[in-house]
């Protein structure tokens, strides 16, 4: 049967408790039912907070809704901004990205790649910079392909059928200033994302 179903979820973020002690760094090996539930609850809350829409093979969201969700549901700074690379020089873009990383802020990053004439986008996290000027990229995908990469290429190897890699070097954008609002910096860890 084909078709589509949509339903909304309600999450009380003020009282949502995260079981950080049972969230593993890596789920590719064995894990307990409690560890599976802990990470599932976190992913569920993040998706709900940012108004993600899920399909059979992907999830999508509107960037304005994502930013609203980060700020209003997850108490991320009202200074958070969604920026498109095309509006900045390379030097300006690199300086903004480096400023975030020097401040200890992870950066939500978006890139697209072309495959058979179709553009496909992906969002991931940049959370480090090495001495050669390459950025540490967490592409998702259970750690598959995570690496230090050139920001102008952002290639992830072996993630598509047949082991093909992709380069997220088109339509780049990022969310900057992702840090807790001041009133939540000392909030109990179990209630923070």
Where are the language model's segments positioned?
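Cysteine-nucleophile protease catalytic domains, especially the papain-like/related folds used
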Residues: 1-85
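Short, Φ-rich (hydrophobic/aromatic) sequence segments
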Residues: 36-57, 96-103, 159-174
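Cys-His-centered catalytic/binding microenvironment captured across papain-like cysteine peptidases
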Residues: 102, 116-120, 129-193
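Active-site-adjacent substructure of cysteine-protease-like catalytic cores
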Residues: 68, 72-138
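Generic detector of bulky aromatic hydrophobic side chains
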Residues: 32, 36, 43-46, 60, ...
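Generic detector of intrinsically disordered, low-complexity, polar/charged segments
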Residues: 44, 52, 66, 125, ...
């Amino acid at each position: 049967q084909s078709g589509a179903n949509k339903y909304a979820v309600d999450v009380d973020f003020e009282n949502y408790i995260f079981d950080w002690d049972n969230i593993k760094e890596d789920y590719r090996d064995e894990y307990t039912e409690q560890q599976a539930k802990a990470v599932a609850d976190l992913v569920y809350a993040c998706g709900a907070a940012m108004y993600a829409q899920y399909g059979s093979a992907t999830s999508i969201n509107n960037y304005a809704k994502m930013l609203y969700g980060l700020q209003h549901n997850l108490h991320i700074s009202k200074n958070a901004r969604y920026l498109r690379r095309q509006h900045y020089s390379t030097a300006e873009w690199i300086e903004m990205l480096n400023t975030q990383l020097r401040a200890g802020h992870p950066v939500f990053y978006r890139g697209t790649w072309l495959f058979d004439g179709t553009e496909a986008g992906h969002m991931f996290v940049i959370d480090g910079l090495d001495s050669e000027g390459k950025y540490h990229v967490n592409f998702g995908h259970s750690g598959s392909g995570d690496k230090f990469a050139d920001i102008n290429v952002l290639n992830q190897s072996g993630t598509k059928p047949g082991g093909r890699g992709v380069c997220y070097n088109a339509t780049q954008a990022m969310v900057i200033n992702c840090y807790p609002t001041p009133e939540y910096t000392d909030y109990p860890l179990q209630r923070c994302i």
